[in-house]
């Protein structure tokens, strides 16, 4: 009888431990998901802060354009358009709070920020890259570019035919040479999701935002 009770107690204990293990895994997964969501929201907040600030400086930056001063990573840092957690890599690149790399530069009549979303072993997961690509298009680029006549959004898209590498959206719906492209006003969750899936298979995914 005692042996039977002992065996039953051991089985019950193992069952309890199994339940605890499952709950622990679920808790860790839930925490990871919540942390990833927090990072996305934080990145969107910081990107929006930077772009909103750059919009105020665009005209002056374009006036002072030259090949020698086309890259503006140092300017962005000195103008306090980004948090102190961002790091200047060199005159070309600046890294955000989560290790994603940005290349901001000006032209004679434009300002562009290229976002390189990283998800190698030292940075984020491929799902984070996908989610951040989505957020960049829907929560950062769209609210800004929908109100700008000359805005553009470029996203890596491995699924495109004819060796094209980017899906292009323009506020005007046309490139400067008259080529018809997607309209900023037509941006929607389903299309952006399909495009941003390219980020899952890449160690570095590129999203570009430009305006005049």
Where are these regions (language model features)?
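Intrinsically disordered, low-complexity regions enriched in Pro/Ser/Thr/Gly and acidic residues
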Residues: 86-212
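A general marker of short, structured functional hotspots
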Residues: 27, 43, 53, 89, ...
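Membrane-proximal N-terminal amphipathic helix
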Residues: 29-65
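Short, glycine/small-hydrophobic-rich surface segments
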Residues: 54-90
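N-terminal single-pass transmembrane signal-anchor helix
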Residues: 1-35, 43
């Amino acid at each position: 009888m005692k042996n039977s009770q002992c065996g039953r107690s051991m089985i019950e204990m193992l069952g309890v431990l199994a339940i605890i293990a499952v709950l622990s895994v679920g808790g860790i997964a839930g925490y990871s998901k919540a942390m990833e969501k927090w990072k996305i929201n934080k990145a969107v907040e910081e990107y929006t802060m930077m772009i909103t600030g750059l919009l105020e400086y665009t005209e002056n930056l374009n006036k002072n354009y030259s090949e020698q001063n086309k890259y503006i990573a140092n300017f962005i840092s000195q103008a306090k358009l980004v948090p102190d957690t961002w790091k200047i890599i060199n005159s070309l690149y600046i890294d955000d709070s989560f290790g994603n790399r940005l290349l901001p530069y000006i032209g004679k009549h434009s300002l562009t920020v290229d976002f390189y979303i990283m998800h190698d072993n030292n940075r984020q997961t491929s799902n984070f890259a996908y989610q951040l690509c989505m957020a960049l298009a829907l929560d950062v680029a769209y609210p800004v570019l929908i109100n700008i006549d000359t805005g553009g959004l470029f996203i890596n898209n491995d699924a495109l035919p004819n060796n094209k590498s980017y899906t292009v959206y323009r506020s005007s719906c046309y490139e400067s040479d008259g080529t018809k492209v997607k309209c900023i006003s037509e941006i929607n969750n389903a299309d952006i999701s399909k495009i941003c899936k390219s980020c899952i298979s890449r160690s570095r995914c590129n999203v570009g935002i430009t305006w005049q």
